[in-house]
């Protein structure tokens, strides 16, 4: 007898939800025709024949802007639930959120001073 009988539905759901994608990939692999040709090996750019080399070097500045964007995007994700329940949480949660924002502002000032936000 299974000791955690109340989890039977959970395990059944987990097994079924794991089996469905595996079966979908197996069935599509078995039923799909395999045709290799020059068109399958070429790059696809919105229906236009690609011109030039597909491998481009990106400047490191794009990386720095993306990194700063991700940091502040994650900040927004963390602050949104706090803002929705601001009136319930009280002063201690406000002080914690204020400390969180101040740490992120310090990080922004540091990145600014290091020149991470300058495009030159």
Curated annotation (Swiss-Prot):
<dbReference type="InterPro" id="IPR038430">
    <property type="entry name" value="NDAH_ubi_oxred_su3_sf"/>
</dbReference>
<dbReference type="GO" id="GO:0048038">
    <property type="term" value="F:quinone binding"/>
</dbReference>
<dbReference type="GO" id="GO:0008137">
    <property type="term" value="F:NADH dehydrogenase (ubiquinone) activity"/>
</dbReference>
<dbReference type="InterPro" id="IPR023043">
    <property type="entry name" value="NAD(P)H_OxRDtase_bac/plastid"/>
</dbReference>
<comment type="function">
    <text>NDH shuttles electrons from NAD(P)H:plastoquinone, via FMN and iron-sulfur (Fe-S) centers, to quinones in the photosynthetic chain and possibly in a chloroplast respiratory chain. The immediate electron acceptor for the enzyme in this species is believed to be plastoquinone. Couples the redox reaction to proton translocation, and thus conserves the redox energy in a proton gradient.</text>
</comment>
<comment type="subunit">
    <text>NDH is composed of at least 16 different subunits, 5 of which are encoded in the nucleus.</text>
</comment>
<keyword id="KW-0472">Membrane</keyword>
<comment type="similarity">
    <text>Belongs to the complex I subunit 3 family.</text>
</comment>
<protein>
    <recommendedName>
        <fullName>NAD(P)H-quinone oxidoreductase subunit 3, chloroplastic</fullName>
        <ecNumber>7.1.1.-</ecNumber>
    </recommendedName>
</protein>
<keyword id="KW-1278">Translocase</keyword>
<keyword id="KW-0618">Plastoquinone</keyword>
<keyword id="KW-0520">NAD</keyword>
<keyword id="KW-0812">Transmembrane</keyword>
<feature type="transmembrane region" description="Helical">
    <location>
        <begin position="64"/>
        <end position="84"/>
    </location>
</feature>
<keyword id="KW-0934">Plastid</keyword>
<keyword id="KW-0521">NADP</keyword>
<feature type="transmembrane region" description="Helical">
    <location>
        <begin position="9"/>
        <end position="29"/>
    </location>
</feature>
<keyword id="KW-0813">Transport</keyword>
<keyword id="KW-0150">Chloroplast</keyword>
<feature type="transmembrane region" description="Helical">
    <location>
        <begin position="88"/>
        <end position="108"/>
    </location>
</feature>
<dbReference type="Pfam" id="PF00507">
    <property type="entry name" value="Oxidored_q4"/>
</dbReference>
<keyword id="KW-0793">Thylakoid</keyword>
<keyword id="KW-0874">Quinone</keyword>
<dbReference type="GO" id="GO:0019684">
    <property type="term" value="P:photosynthesis, light reaction"/>
</dbReference>
<keyword id="KW-1133">Transmembrane helix</keyword>
<dbReference type="GO" id="GO:0009535">
    <property type="term" value="C:chloroplast thylakoid membrane"/>
</dbReference>
<dbReference type="InterPro" id="IPR000440">
    <property type="entry name" value="NADH_UbQ/plastoQ_OxRdtase_su3"/>
</dbReference>
<dbReference type="GO" id="GO:0030964">
    <property type="term" value="C:NADH dehydrogenase complex"/>
</dbReference>
């Amino acid at each position: 007898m299974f000791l955690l009988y109340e989890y039977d539905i959970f395990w059944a759901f987990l097994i079924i939800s794991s089996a469905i994608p595996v079966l979908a990939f197996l069935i599509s692999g078995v039923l799909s025709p395999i045709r290799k040709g020059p068109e399958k090996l070429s790059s696809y750019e919105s229906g236009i024949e690609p011109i030039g080399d597909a491998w481009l070097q990106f400047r490191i500045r794009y990386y720095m802007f993306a990194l700063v964007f991700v940091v502040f995007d994650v900040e927004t994700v963390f602050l949104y639930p706090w803002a929705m329940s601001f009136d319930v949480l009280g002063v201690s949660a406000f002080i914690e959120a204020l400390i969180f924002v101040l740490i992120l502002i310090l990080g922004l000032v540091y990145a600014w001073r290091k020149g991470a936000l300058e495009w030159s």
